[in-house]
Amino acid sequence: MPVYRLTASSIISSFRVSGKRHLLLTGGRGTGKTTLLRALVPLLCPGAQEITTAAYPADRVEIRESVGGKIAVIGRFDPALPPGENRMRPVADGFLLLGVPALHRMAAGESEWAVLDELGYLENSCPEFRQAVEALLDAKRVLAVVRKQDTPFLNAL
């Protein structure tokens, strides 16, 4: 039996009919969340400010602000952690010095939308970052990729 994937335009149509304020994409690793987000941005919220993350396995996770291209490390690989998915230790300075101010700038910006790719378990470690995400959700419409994991922060989203 063939597997059918929804197109970006059909997802946007369903989203608009739903009356929802935010569009959160969730799923396991490698399921195409970021690919779908990249297809949705030009159709739903072109020109929106973005915060993206990039993971470098066995090394680090970086956060990047689209305006100005600033980058900070928010996670560092720790080989002492048990083998599995979550072997990065949060780096508070990355969240506090770049992530939180970037979220505040997005909330104060002119665009109706903000884009976050992706929110995961590292963010759970920084209350200030979590609060800034919540404030952004109150201030803007948000298109976001949310990692499918069981953490208090991600569950609250």
Residue ranges of model-derived segments:
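Extreme N-terminal, non-catalytic leader segments
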Residues: 1-21
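A short linear-motif detector with a strong N-terminal bias
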Residues: 2-4, 28-33, 42-45, 121-124, ...
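A conditional alpha-helix N-cap/helix-loop micro-motif detector
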Residues: 3-5, 88, 92-96, 122-126
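Conserved P-loop
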Residues: 14-104, 156-157
